[in-house]
Each structure stands twice: as structure tokens, then as C-alpha cells.
């Protein structure tokens, strides 16, 4: 697992740096998507997350969910044109999961991409993700990631 300023980036995920999201390839043509550790730190304590409806088709750059914290309300944008085939019901009942487990229990939606070959070039992993987020954090003048009690990545 890579780490930048106490912000964790698991090696087995793909990232879209600008949207501050991760994608996990499920090996069946679907991807789970969620917010990065950096995004959950920027948002602060998340109090609500509402995903778009299952079955909805979303275009790259559009919102798949809205997240609300004490200091921020905003969209979670998808880097892939896709159909939302599932949403994480656990976070609908307890949005703090996005803070305590952004990469494990905190997936937001499951996507079935329709233009993966055309759009996957914007996703990064490994050293490219690390360098991309270093630049992102520097440009946004972000310090260290903050982890809640019980944080498990």
C-alpha cells in the first residue's frame, strides 16, 4: 500500500486523480467505486451519502452520488460512462463508513462500464497514482490525511 502524507492508496485499485475516486475491477466486467482517503479527509465527517438509482446510466464526469459532511456537500463523479448496477446500502444507513473504511466497506456504487476501452486511459495505478496524488495534494495545499477512530482503510 502506498502512502502520501498519511493518506493511503491501496496498490490493487485504479484511481482517477481529478475526481479523487478509486475503482476496483471485480473481474466480471463490473467495477466498485468509492472516495479516496484524500477525499474523505477533505470532506470531513460524512453525515449522508445518497447514490443515484440502480439502473441509471451515467456519463463520464457526471455524479453517481452526493456526499454531505459538516463542511461540504458535493458530487462523487464517475470517470467511466456506465450503468449503476448496485449501490452500497450500508452507507445509506451509516455514511461514516466512508470515513472509517473508504476502500473496503465504503464502496459507493458498482458500475458496468459501456466505454471502458475508450475511457480507461484516464485511470492510474501504482507509481502513476502516487505521483498524481502528490501533485494534487500540493496544488490543493493539503496536509496529512486524518483518520477516524476505527479506521481500517
Where do the PLM segments sit?
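Conserved interaction-surface patches within small, structured recognition/assembly domains
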Residues: 47-48, 63-69
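Small beta-strand-rich domains/subdomains or short beta-sheet motifs embedded
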Residues: 68, 74-77
Amino acid at each position: 500500500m502506498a502512502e502520501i502524507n498519511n493518506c493511503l492508496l491501496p496498490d490493487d485499485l485504479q484511481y482517477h486523480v481529478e475526481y479523487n475516486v478509486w475503482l476496483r475491477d471485480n473481474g466480471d466486467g463490473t467495477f466498485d467505486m468509492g472516495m479516496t482517503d484524500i477525499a474523505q479527509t477533505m470532506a470531513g465527517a460524512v453525515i449522508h451519502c445518497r447514490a443515484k438509482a440502480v439502473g441509471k446510466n451515467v456519463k463520464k464526469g457526471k455524479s453517481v452520488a452526493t456526499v454531505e459532511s459538516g463542511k461540504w456537500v458535493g458530487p462523487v463523479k464517475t470517470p467511466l460512462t456506465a450503468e449503476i448496477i448496485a449501490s452500497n446500502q450500508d452507507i445509506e444507513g451509516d455514511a461514516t463508513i466512508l470515513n472509517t473504511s473508504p476502500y473496503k466497506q465504503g464502496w459507493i456504487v458498482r458500475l458496468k462500464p459501456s466505454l471502458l476501452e475508450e475511457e480507461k486511459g484516464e485511470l492510474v495505478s501504482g507509481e502513476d497514482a502516487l505521483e498524481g496524488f502528490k501533485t494534487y495534494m500540493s496544488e490543493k495545499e493539503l496536509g496529512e490525511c486524518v483518520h477516524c477512530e476505527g479506521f481500517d482503510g
